[in-house]
Design a protein with these regions (language model features):
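Catalytic glutamate of the conserved HExxH
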Residues: 105, 109-113
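Active-site rim/adjacent substrate-binding subdomains
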Residues: 1-101, 113, 117-122, 128-130
C-alpha cells in the first residue's frame, strides 16, 4: 500500500468539504484548497514551527472578523493549505480515518478565521455527512 498522493489528498479535502453542513460551507464560498507535501520555509518561520511536520494546514485570507464580507477588487481568494506529509504522519499515529483528520484540519483552519469557537467547530464536524 502506498501513501496517498497530493491529488488523492485534494480529492479527500473536496469530499470532506462537500460533506460539511451548509451553514458552514456558505461562510466559505470561493475558498480554494491547495495541497503540498510540506509548508515552505517562510510559512514555517511565520508560524514559529520547530519542524516541517508541526503544521498540518493553514488558512490564508480574510475571515469575517477581518472583513471578508467586503468585496475587494484584485484580492486573492481565501485559501486553505493542507500539508500532506505532516497529515500522513499524524494519521499513522492516530486511530482516526484520514478523511476524519482532513475534515478536522479543514474545519479548524477555516473556523478560526471565521471567529468560530471550538464548540462550534466540534458541532460542525459532528454534522458532517460522510
Amino acid at each position: 500500500m502506498s501513501a496517498p498522493t497530493l491529488a488523492e489528498i485534494e480529492a479527500l479535502a473536496d469530499a470532506a468539504f462537500a460533506a460539511l453542513p451548509e451553514k458552514f460551507t456558505r461562510l466559505c464560498e470561493g475558498v480554494v484548497f491547495h495541497v503540498e507535501d510540506f509548508p515552505d520555509e517562510e510559512t514555517l518561520d511565520e508560524m514559529e514551527c520547530e519542524t516541517e511536520f508541526d503544521l498540518l494546514g493553514l488558512f490564508r485570507g480574510k475571515g469575517l472578523p477581518d472583513g471578508a464580507h467586503l468585496a475587494e477588487t484584485g484580492a486573492e481568494p481565501n485559501m486553505v493549505w493542507l500539508y500532506r506529509r505532516p497529515i500522513l504522519d499524524f494519521w499513522a499515529e492516530s486511530e482516526d480515518t484520514l478523511g476524519d483528520i482532513i475534515t478536522h484540519v479543514l474545519v479548524h483552519e477555516i473556523g478560526h478565521h471565521f471567529g468560530l469557537s471550538d464548540a462550534d467547530m466540534e458541532e460542525i464536524e459532528r454534522g458532517a455527512v460522510l
